[in-house]
Amino acid sequence: MASFMKQLSLVLSFIALALAGCAVYQNTQTAMKDQLKVTPTWLDNTLKSTNLLSLGLGKPSGGKLGDEACVFSAVKEVVVAAINAEARMGASLIRLFFHDCFVDGCDAGLLLNDTATFTGEQTAAGNNNSVRGFAVIEQAKQNVKTQMPDMSVSCADILSIAARDSFEKFSGSTYTVTLGRKDARTANFTGANTQLVGPNENLTSQLTKFAAKGFNGTEMVALLGSHTIGFARCPLLCISTFINPARVSTLNCNCSGTVNATGLVGLDPTPTTWDQRYFSDVVNDQGLLFSDNELLKGNTTNAAVRRYRDAMGAFLTDFAAAMVKMSNLPPSPGVALEIRDVCSRVNANSVDPCEESRLLASPD
């Protein structure tokens, strides 16, 4: 009988992995490890806890859903660890996602290093010495490959998941990310210089650039609400056209002397807490960036700022919806696409494992 139960447990382990993915598989393995009896009651409870019964045991889509669940789990594992090690990383990953998708769609073009045939986007004005989190995305990519070697997931997908997980980690809210994006085989340095919104842009310019991507003024304000977390670097803030003049005296950057090159200033006074303080500051003329305070100059944007200041639920809902919309911005027509083996370069005939290890170990 004991031998039969052991065999049954092994069979259930493989069935569970194929049909329900990570959750049932891990529960089954725990039962085996702890030498629990695999009874009909135990199996029924396990299936119910993972919603397998609602999927239908015979549906072929169960395997795909399980695979995708494992992908999401593998990415979240890396993202959460990175944020736990450095809270600033959450805002950095959201910004990395935004700066990628806003230039020619979500194609991971921003992740590409310069090559002999093109200049990447990382040294464009809005990105240079600013965007970060590349190593986290590379590590998440490797974790997916390790845990799901037969699952091909693009760097663009991983970046989209990482941004969602960062939002979830800080806000406690979430939204759905679908898979299926592909990675560009080139980057657009010129596009990064012209399409991204800078901290010195007036309201008209901001609205024009967001409208070009299909976003209205309210959606723009919701997305800019991500400034509720994160920091700005002193070298940027010491550029007079980038900062709200009312905030100059609050900085500790030594802008009149030798600028504190490594100094950071919170985008709002609570830069590691997802709250409504950003909107309160904008209403009170205390937004850090020039572009932040411009939001009060339009009827629609002014109303949105005040609404989100007063209603966290509305802010979370609208931000999530705008992020879903952002994540679905398509690559430019005609751009060659692939699923990269390493996020920082286009595919070759093979990937040098030593080079891949070096890339994964390198700092941002």
From Swiss-Prot:
It is found in: Secreted. It is an enzyme of class 1 (oxidoreductase). Induction: By wounding and cold stress. Weakly induced by acclimation and strongly induced by chilling treatment. Residues 21-66 form a propeptide. It catalyses: 2 a phenolic donor + H2O2 = 2 a phenolic radical donor + 2 H2O. Coiled coil: none annotated. Ca(2+) 2 binds at residues 228, 268, 270, 275. This is Anionic peroxidase. It comes from Ipomoea batatas.
